[in-house]
């Protein structure tokens, strides 16, 4: 009986017993219970049906025993061909995304890796053909298991390997564990939560959170205003335009959206007093964002993204406690909208030119 092309493809469907998964996806527990589903899904790379493994890893952090359920997304053949994890599709050696790894190897190696690859082809039949040919090569020469001839990882020169190591060290903390023989190191931005909170508390204690625009400070050297309640959709140019129109020339404007606050420094004390006088009760509304404004000298608003984020959470919590939260926090504080500037009436659309 003559076999058809569909029968040949079915013969090459993958049925494996053990997946190729990185240590990050496996979790901290060396004893993992997995479920196996034969031909459970199509491979994300070659589109052939393959054996799907599912498991629930345990997290290494304290206070949380289990992570989210994981499964294999690519077949073992494509995993060997790309030298990547079947679950997260990161490089098994360096923990890098495949696009970054291949781009780094292409820069270091002359000529790149010729021939067809799964990433360069979009046709389903071509992908299956490439996977089948590579599978035959694996059967003929088991050395290809460690020598990745398609991506060139196994044949990378020392310069390319050095570049990959540098990229792996520069990637986020979860990829540093791929470096063998190194201890668990955390970057500066991933410090202990208690130490981070203590540092941010010191920063927040120096900010004029309880201040206002009145009275005017006696110190004539203060020419800056502190504002908080900044949301992500409030651009810096809107803030700059407002203070330029109400005050005058600005010498420095610092807006940290992650910390939900910022400073504006005027060139003269008179310009700062003029801008403060245009703000009623220390409250200002720009693009629907309710800001709190106060006199204050420029201070540090966090030297890292973690510090700025933590400071922003403290500021949002303070604003909610005072009933002056932004419009993104729901209905709280809607009845505390800032009154209009002195001398300007409120115009409603239904009243035409009538002023109240």
UniProtKB/Swiss-Prot annotation:
Known role: Involved in pre-mRNA splicing. Facilitates the cooperative formation of U2/U6 helix II in association with stem II in the spliceosome. Binds to RNA.
Q: Which organism's genome codes for this protein?
A: Yarrowia lipolytica (strain CLIB 122 / E 150) (Yeast)
- Where does the RRM domain lie? 223-298
According to the UniProt entry, its GO molecular function terms are: pre-mRNA binding; U6 snRNA binding
The superkingdom of the source organism is Eukaryota
Q: Which family does it belong to?
A: Belongs to the SLT11 family.
Mainly localized where?
A: nucleus
Q: What is this protein called?
A: Pre-mRNA-splicing factor SLT11
Q: Where in the cell is it found?
A: Nucleus
Q: Name one GO cellular component term.
A: U2-type catalytic step 1 spliceosome
- The reply to whether Cell division figures as a keyword in the UniProt entry is no
Subunit-structure text: Associated with the spliceosome.
The segment annotated Disordered runs over 321-356
List, alphabetically, the PROSITE patterns matched: RRM
Q: Which gene encodes it?
A: SLT11
Q: Which InterPro entries match?
A: Cwc2/Slt11, Nucleotide-bd_a/b_plait_sf, RBD_domain_sf, RRM_dom, Slt11_RRM, STL11/RBM22-like_N
For the keyword Nucleus, the answer is yes
